[in-house]
Each structure stands twice: as structure tokens, then as C-alpha cells.
Amino acid sequence: MASRIKKGDQVIVIAGKDKGKQGEIIRIDGHRVVVSNVNFVKRHTKPNPQRGISGGLIDREAPIHVSNIKILNPMTGKGDRVGFKILGDGCKLRIFRSTGEVIGA
């Protein structure tokens, strides 16, 4: 089954504390995604001299639920829904619902 979102897609956050922010999908974990420069949390880390890690507070991105993002349509500059189009040879393409343009082409 084809996925509605993929790693590297440009998305916009539609709900939560970071509503309106845009970023790129870094990682997908089931129904949660990590988006660059969105949903920063502070992590307390111990120093580890073997790995060269200094201790303290580290800001990093935390995952958000996939229902809180929409894929960014570059033609309109807004979030858009994703649809699928099946070609004659059986290929399944992702398309923007509002414009019908193929995503990533």
C-alpha cells in the first residue's frame, strides 16, 4: 500500500503548539513523524567522554502525530490533502487533491 506521506516531503503543521510551521519529514515511526525545526523538546543528557558527548540540556525534535500535518502544495503555498491516481500500467501516483498535480514530479 502506498503511503500518503514520505520521508523528505515538505509539510505544514495544522494543529498543536507549532501550528503554521513548515518543515521537512526526517523520520516516520508508524503514525508519528519527526519534522525538522518543529516540536523541540529539551533532553537531559549525562556526559559520556567515550563518545565525546558533553552533558546538559539538548534541544531536539520530538515526533508529532501524522494527523497534525498536511503536505505543502508548492503551487498554492498551503497544506493539501493527498490522493492517489492509478495509471494504465498499474503504477500508483500521489497527487494533490486541490490541483491534481503529481507530488514530487
From Swiss-Prot:
GO terms for biological process: translation. Transmembrane segments: none annotated. The keyword Ribonucleoprotein applies. GO terms for cellular component: ribonucleoprotein complex; ribosome. Keywords: Ribonucleoprotein, Ribosomal protein, RNA-binding, rRNA-binding. InterPro entries: KOW (IPR005824), Rib_uL2_dom2 (IPR014722), Ribosomal_uL24 (IPR003256), Ribosomal_uL24_CS (IPR005825), Ribosomal_uL24_KOW (IPR041988), Translation_prot_SH3-like_sf (IPR008991). GO terms for molecular function: rRNA binding; structural constituent of ribosome. The keyword Metal-binding does not apply. Belongs to the universal ribosomal protein uL24 family. One of two assembly initiator proteins, it binds directly to the 5'-end of the 23S rRNA, where it nucleates assembly of the 50S subunit. NCBIfam families: rplX_bact. PANTHER family: MITOCHONDRIAL RIBOSOMAL PROTEIN L24. Part of the 50S ribosomal subunit. This is Large ribosomal subunit protein uL24. The gene is rplX.
